[in-house]
Amino acid sequence: MVYIDPKHLELEDRVVAINRVTKVVKGGRRLRFAALVVVGDKNGHVGFGTGKAQEVPEAIRKAIEDAKKNLVEVPMVGSTIPHEVIGVFGGGRILMKPAVEGSGVAAGGPVRAVLELAGVADITSKSLGSNTPINVVRATVEGLKQLKRAEEVAALRGKSVEEIIG
């Protein structure tokens, strides 16, 4: 995975989930907050991160910092993805299909956040497994990592791009 420097990108962030987690100790319960945040430049770069802290804003800040360290590049054809892909992480399975221009983002919840911040404007997706936000986000990003441009596929097969496209 190639490191993408977040300093050169204009990143937007979106909080996907905030969880209240409790640790039971002898004196009672200790409350903390866990935040899941997605960042992206709406131009082919997206990442996610998690953060935990005693206060919600601090957890979000940590999650944003973490997300900036985990940026991935998303290959795109116009405003959609180059081919169909299934992203899997844990129990989360996300099917993503390219869509014609103007159809918009047909995705729910955490998947929509990832795809919109990646800059994918036209796509159809379906969540096939777990609906836990962290697994869904990770599965979506795994799917986006699997995407290949026509040039990459042609090079792997030892053919020209024209032969691949058809």
Swiss-Prot record:
One of its GO terms (molecular function) is rRNA binding. Keywords: Ribonucleoprotein, Ribosomal protein, RNA-binding, rRNA-binding. NCBIfam families: rpsE_bact. It comes from Enterococcus faecalis (strain ATCC 700802 / V583). Residues 11-74 form the S5 DRBM domain. This is Small ribosomal subunit protein uS5. One of its GO terms (cellular component) is small ribosomal subunit. The N-terminal domain interacts with the head of the 30S subunit; the C-terminal domain interacts with the body and contacts protein S4. The interaction surface between S4 and S5 is involved in control of translational fidelity. Part of the 30S ribosomal subunit. Contacts proteins S4 and S8. PANTHER family: MITOCHONDRIAL RIBOSOMAL PROTEIN S5. Pfam families: Ribosomal_S5, Ribosomal_S5_C. With S4 and S12 plays an important role in translational accuracy. Belongs to the universal ribosomal protein uS5 family. It comes from the Bacteria. One of its GO terms (biological process) is translation.
